[in-house]
UniProtKB/Swiss-Prot annotation:
Region annotation (Loop III) ranges: 64-75
Keyword Secreted appears in the UniProt entry: yes
Major location category of this protein: secreted
Coiled-coil residues: none
Site for Moderately important residue for binding to acetylcholine receptor, residues: 27, 30, 46, 53, 55
Pfam families xref list: Toxin_cobra-type
Protein name, per record: Erabutoxin c
Subcellular location: Secreted
Source organism of the structure: Laticauda semifasciata (Black-banded sea krait)
Stretches for region Loop I: 24-38
Positions of region (Stretch between loop I and loop II): 39-44
Keyword set includes Signal: yes
Record region (Loop II): 45-62
Amino acid sequence: MKTLLLTLVVVTIVCLDLGYTRICFNHQSSQPQTTKTCSPGESSCYHKQWSDFRGTIIERGCGCPTVKPGINLSCCESEVCNN
């Protein structure tokens, strides 16, 4: 009986998602580096870059958003990969 209970506990731990979350950079342009713990279910980070009257703008964060034409977007799926 103890063996069965132990087996069930191990199977439960292995099968459950134990709350792993991605960590991405989220600083903008030339600001000091900061990171953010992404929401559950967000498994990627993004690096978005475009130019306007202010110069080159860089935005970083969690997820992989859709962008308008003229905006360079790169998405990645490892820890703090969007620098």
